[in-house]
Amino acid sequence: MQELRFVLIIVGALAIAALLFHGLWTSKKEGKSKFGDKPLRKMKVESDDPPSRAFAAEDDFEIIRKERKEPDFGIPNQQHDPLISDFAAHDELDEEEDEEARIPVQPQSQPQPRKVQPQVEMPRVAPNVPMAKVQPEVVTEIEVQEPQEEKLDVIVLNVHCAGNQPFIGTKLFDSMQQNGLLFGEMDIFHRHADLSGTGKVLFSVANMMQPGTLMHDDPADFSTKGISFFMTLPCFGDPEQNFKLMLKTAQQIADDLGGHVLDDARNLMTPNRLDAYRKQIQEFKVRAAQA
């Protein structure tokens, strides 16, 4: 730090000397130019001559007395010369710097390192925003009314053997085929609207005994005590005509095998029971028309 001050003092002194030299040189140059530009006038009258000296009338000119002013080579007024004022200011600064240089420089105490407290980031707490109460959505259950399945009516007729001798498969299956019944789905026989077996089913024939099927490998080995005829309402075509055809087929097979026609309760068929079947069919037709 002290060496830097010495360097600044030396540089300041050189700058002041340069400014002084420049100022003196400029002043001399201005003085010479003023003296050289002045016109030559007549010589100064001797100082011992009286000022009221008369001249002859014949003189064609008058000697003009004028005091000659010697050129001033002195230093101009410092107040009007900016260079000199600057030099004075620099001199004052140099004197102050010299005085500061004489003052012993006390060693500066090293600043004690401050203990830096580690910054602990505080957890950001989310603003307490009141939560809107969510009203439970009331779901209105719409009762979908499923279409009610149409109630099926089943009309059943049975053909049972007359005694203890069961129906043998050979004669039974032969008689059934002759009356338009064909073996098909669910291992039972069906009567189709078309005798070729491609039309809609009008009624079907199953085994009266368990398990209800008429499945057989050899007709001669098959035997049963009876078969059941059944038709469902609604059915394909006219239900009354289908019932007449089913009743006629059952009576024909019973005649072929020597059996009896029974109702759904396995009782002998009577005219009153036949009327009850017909009435059941009529009532079904009325309900179907009103639906």
From Swiss-Prot:
CDD domains: ZipA. Residues 29-51 have a biased composition (Basic and acidic residues). Residues 27-291 are cytoplasmic. It holds the Pfam family ZipA_C. The keyword DNA damage does not apply. Keywords: Cell cycle, Cell division, Cell inner membrane, Cell membrane, Membrane, Transmembrane, Transmembrane helix. The keyword Cell division applies. It is a single-pass type I membrane protein. The chain crosses the membrane at residues 6-26. It is found in: Cell inner membrane. Residues 29-61, 92-119 are annotated as: Disordered. GO terms for cellular component: cell division site; plasma membrane. Residues 1-5 are periplasmic. One of its GO terms (biological process) is FtsZ-dependent cytokinesis. HAMAP family: ZipA. Interacts with FtsZ via their C-terminal domains. Essential cell division protein that stabilizes the FtsZ protofilaments by cross-linking them and that serves as a cytoplasmic membrane anchor for the Z ring. Also required for the recruitment to the septal ring of downstream cell division proteins. PANTHER family: CELL DIVISION PROTEIN ZIPA. Belongs to the ZipA family. This is Cell division protein ZipA. The gene is zipA.
